[in-house]
Regions:
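Signature of N6-adenine DNA methyltransferases within the class I
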Residues: 1-152
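A generic secondary-structure signal for well-formed alpha-helical elements
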Residues: 38-42, 55, 81, 218, ...
Length: 372
């Protein structure tokens, strides 16, 4: 499914390197390969996962734009395999032009992976009591995504779209996460289903104008390349479920280097959707979402996130990264004063209260009980 939805990180170079490692494991062979930095990191993880004996694993980064004219982050990966029962928990990173001085290091501490092992951050690593979700995926933005001009919906072709607003929802795309609280919208999206592979025929009667609009553009839906749509009901979407219709969400763009978590809600109570390059957790009340947003944007949590994410990755903040945030550990050390400080740093009006924070702690305590 990861391969179908585009979330897998398969790379042919990675496959070749892993084949070489399998071929020469348990020998003193040195393997050196040019590859993307993300591939090098994945190879290091595979060395550990497969319990391959190796003396060292180093990365020598260079400017790929100067050498090859490409924008990818690239390196020379240098692996010293071993015929002895030895393994390193650390991968060191150097500059190719100045290899005598280490730039950084990453690796494992107590079985947990960290992107930066130098510098101090709180240990908020664990399991997130809230489930991080991705937004909707439709691969037909010109038709499904709308803007409003003079009170009329316009699609991506700037055509007027005269449809019911019943299944039209506010949309926040990854590039729109620019404020800690978002409740004004310039984009909207047609959401055709409540859950994956739900039949859509009922829309013909429920929202006839919308059905007619979609039907008039059926050929564009048929041209969607991803095989996930093959055999699915007409105008199907993915990344959709009951969670999509939560009134309050705390979301983040997967692309930003510096993470900003935003409370998402609409003034009319209509659920806010995000695109599939964004991630969010759901809440039943604004107050609980607000507390979570402050915690996640606090300096201590931000520093922790920097220690487990690779900022040169195309998408630094993935579900795998976010689900390591342990709210129980966070609230055990963060005080109301910390939240007030974060509120001030975000230029928000004073809103957080001791009562709200206590209520939030009780809430995640109940969630934790349900999970155990």
């Amino acid at each position: 499914m990861d391969a179908l939805t585009g979330t897998s990180n398969f790379d042919i170079c990675e496959y070749i390197i892993l084949q070489l490692i399998d071929e020469y494991r348990d020998t003193n062979t040195v393997i050196s390969m040019l590859c993307k930095t993300s591939v090098a990191r994945n190879v290091f993880k595979e060395l550990k996962r497969k319990k391959v004996a190796f003396r060292s694993c180093d990365i020598l980064e260079f400017d790929a734009s100067k050498v090859f004219g490409i924008s990818a982050s690239a390196c020379v990966l240098l692996i010293q395999l071993s015929d002895k029962d030895e393994v390193s928990d650390i991968c060191c990173v150097y500059d190719f032009e100045y290899p005598e001085k280490r730039k950084s290091k990453f690796g494992y501490i107590n079985g947990q992976f960290y992107s930066h092992l130098e510098g101090q951050s709180d240990n908020f690593n664990g399991y997130c009591c809230f489930e991080w979700r991705q937004g909707v995926k439709h691969d037909c933005s010109k038709i499904m995504e709308l803007s409003v001009k003079d009170g009329i919906f316009k699609n991506g072709f700037q055509e007027s779209v005269l449809i019911e607003d019943t299944i039209v929802y506010p949309l926040i795309k990854s590039s729109m996460f620019k404020a800690p609280i978002i409740h004004n919208f310039s984009k909207y999206v047609i959401v055709t289903q409540k859950k994956i592979r739900e039949d859509t025929e009922h829309l013909k009667n429920d929202v006839p104008k919308t059905w007619e609009y979609l039907s008039n553009n059926e050929e564009k839906f048929k041209r969607r390349k991803s095989s996930i749509y093959h055999g699915a009901p007409l105008f199907s979407m993915f990344g959709i479920g009951e969670y999509s219709y939560s009134k309050y969400k705390v979301g983040i763009s997967g692309f930003y280097k510096k993470p900003l978590f935003s409370v998402l809600f609409s003034d009319d109570g209509k659920p806010v959707m995000t695109d599939d390059t964004s991630y969010f957790i759901c809440f039943d009340s604004y107050d609980m979402a607000y507390v979570a947003m402050l915690l996640l944007n606090s300096e201590r949590v931000q520093n922790f996130l920097m220690s487990i994410a690779f900022l040169d990755a195309k998408r630094p903040y993935t579900k795998k990264v976010l689900e390591r945030i342990d709210f129980n550990k966070i609230v055990s050390v963060m005080t109301i004063e910390h939240l007030k400080e974060t509120e001030k740093e975000l230029n928000l009006s004073e809103y957080i209260s001791e009562y709200m924070y206590i209520d939030f702690k009780k809430s995640i305590g109940m969630i934790q009980l349900c999970l155990t």
